[in-house]
Amino acid sequence: MASPALEELVLNSRHRLVRGLKQQKASADQIEEEVAKLLKLKAQLGHDESKQKFVLKTPKGTRDYSPRQMAVREKVFDVIICCFKRHGAEVIDTPVFELKETLMGKYGQDCKLIYDLKDQGGELLSLRYDLTVPFGRYLAMNNLTNIKRYHIAKVYRRDNPAMTRGRYLNSITVDFDIAGQFDPMIPDAECLKIMCEILSSLQIGKFLVKVNDRRILDGMFAVCGVPDSKFRTICSSVDKLDKVSWEEVKNEMVGEKGLAPEVADRIGDYVQQHGEVCLVEQLLQDPKLSQNKQAVEGLGDLKLLFEYLTLFGIDDKISFDLSLARGLDYYTGVIYVAVLLQMPTGAGEEPWCGQCGCWRRYDGLVGMFDPKGRKVPCVGLSIGVERIFSIVEQRLEALEEKVRTTETQVLVASAQKKLAGGETKACLQLWDAGIKAELLYKKNPKLLNQLQYCEETGIPLVAIIGEQELKDGVIKLRSVASREEVDVRREDLVEEIRRRTNQPLYVC
């Protein structure tokens, strides 16, 4: 039997191996294999995890949210949902996990990022990777061919988390989609309009929406001489141009993916171009692209899209970018990405941009699930709210802005001891009328402490009840900000609070 010191040495060696693979970004299968070996070794050595010191923390790539953070998130959601409803959307929900077969074959290389669950009653299940594939399954199951919907829920991805940039292993995704047969590019333009409305309303800084089309990409690769079998892998290289230089991308395509240098150079002539509708018109006259049917169809749709964007007054926020090459296997036509542009705040800092939303047209997804292969044209957007939350939180911290974590409108306070439940009755009266009210759960609270509590939590009004007020049938209503006090008859209290807080006459 090996000594405890030797056992610990072997275990530490295995731990270092697993950590090294993760740092090198090895394949998920290789990491899982080494983790399985490590767990097996622990079992063989009788390694008791319970004897080790337990560290109380959230799992890597996850976090808790404080009341202050949740208040910020709710305000962001209010802006987003208000916009969706303004555009006539309905809301749906789907299970947090799907049959594994439903998700497989929809995400290309990203399939390795899907969380699989243990076998449950003979069904192989996986946590949802996004909200779009479940939506496609929902449409096919219910034989729906026309709907405008939004869905806000968590998705799960075994990715490398970047907490400071709002990238987590489980994150909230906000989707808005339009399914149905409509005139070309009108739903696409509305999706772009919605994203611009939301980002402008949130006031999180400058942003730019990049657009391209999968048909233009495929046509471009074809005329450049890229073999069909390499379309998707070359696509993933091109999409890195927002992070690295063209030379690095070219070296990857030639050195790692076996593309001929002259083919890579032809691709480079195209993908380094970006601009407005004039670039679309220029490419329609391109001697090579103009001979490719897919590219011409994509360019024609983009030209029409820019006409609607001009009509909607958002064309100045849109850029046609040929390097935009991302997209999952079910994406078909126009693709879009919204990026936030954060300018440097100090000397030596570089400007950076971060994706906060994307669009996609996926006309063939529903047909993958429909027994008869019937297609339902779909276009939609996804908003990366986790990144938006991070930016809003950082902005509020920098401004030292106070955030209210409750919506209490009035605190019912007592001025003396033993008031025979007068403050409780007043609070019940307010609750029954739909007023957001609270009182402190203490028998003899000091009035000064109650007023201080209002200042700390941002409660705007205090309803003060004392012995004299009870005798006179009035309640003293105090403004916390101005410290102005006025006597209000008990039967008029609800109306006076509503007037001061601009609350409508209905119960929340």
From Swiss-Prot:
One of its GO terms (molecular function) is RNA binding. It is an enzyme of class 6 (ligase). One of its GO terms (cellular component) is cytoplasm. It comes from the Eukaryota. Transmembrane segments: none annotated. It is found in: Cytoplasm. L-histidine binds at residues 130-132, 157, 177, 326, 330-331. Its EC number is 6.1.1.21. GO terms for biological process: histidyl-tRNA aminoacylation; mitochondrial translation. Residues 3-59 form the WHEP-TRS domain. Signal peptide: none annotated. InterPro entries: aa-tRNA-synth_II/BPL/LPL, Anticodon-bd, Anticodon-bd_dom_sf, HisRS-like_core, HisRS/HisZ, HisRS_anticodon, uS15_NS1_RNA-bd_sf, WHEP-TRS_dom. It catalyses: tRNA(His) + L-histidine + ATP = L-histidyl-tRNA(His) + AMP + diphosphate + H(+). The modification Phosphoserine is found at residue 66. The keyword Aminoacyl-tRNA synthetase applies. Its main location: cytoplasm. Keywords: Aminoacyl-tRNA synthetase, ATP-binding, Cytoplasm, Ligase, Nucleotide-binding, Phosphoprotein, Protein biosynthesis. Catalyzes the ATP-dependent ligation of histidine to the 3'-end of its cognate tRNA, via the formation of an aminoacyl-adenylate intermediate (His-AMP). Plays a role in axon guidance. Homodimer. Belongs to the class-II aminoacyl-tRNA synthetase family. PANTHER family: HISTIDINE--TRNA LIGASE, CYTOPLASMIC, HISTIDYL-TRNA SYNTHETASE. This is Histidine--tRNA ligase, cytoplasmic. The gene is HARS1.
